[in-house]
């Protein structure tokens, strides 16, 4: 096995100090261009490899960005992550991706692990049940950039990246109303999360604009998981006025609901018209195809 070349080997070969070699490799302004070129040429010739970890440590940088997302099996989140990774890699950074599995406790653990790893920044889409944000305090205190995406929370000196969920909810609901729906139901997630609350507000805005009554019976909060489908069907069947329009905050969940409604002999869209959210590929795979918000 060949011996690993060090800056001391380079210094000895070139007849200069180890400090000169180090400053040359780090493009220090005190070193002449001629010396830098000589050092770099010899480094390449001998196969010297920079210890990036040591260099970054001295600069208090890891060239790594952390991301915490609820789940990796979401088409929407996978698309977001692909975009993040491309931008991060193009900028010379690496990406560490972790998932909270919709658990605040797992999110806390992930945040600590990434902090201990020395990430230069953290991007977070909050877990379903996150109600306390103390696990991000170290980032804020130490001025490590903290950015919330999609599912966000407003913390001091932190950025947020979101779409206009309220407008999206309004347009989805208005589409159903334009098709003649008058007794609508919004099936959303935990309204502690901004995305589901904002879509609910948009739903209410559309109802109000078209002078349709809204009360709490027009909103059903769920986990948006297949396990909740039966309870949604039961709720629809129990409503005093027959539901004729359904706005569901997830294409995947909407697809499961369509399947269950058809099993109960509902005709889609004749009996109930349905709009989903995210423009997931599954919207084209169900029968009939699902109208969805992109």
Task: Briefly describe each language-model feature range.
Residues 131-139:
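Active-site-adjacent beta->alpha loops and helix N-cap segments on the catalytic face
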Residues 1, 45, 86-91, 112-118, ...:
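Bacterial carbohydrate/catabolite-sensing allosteric modules
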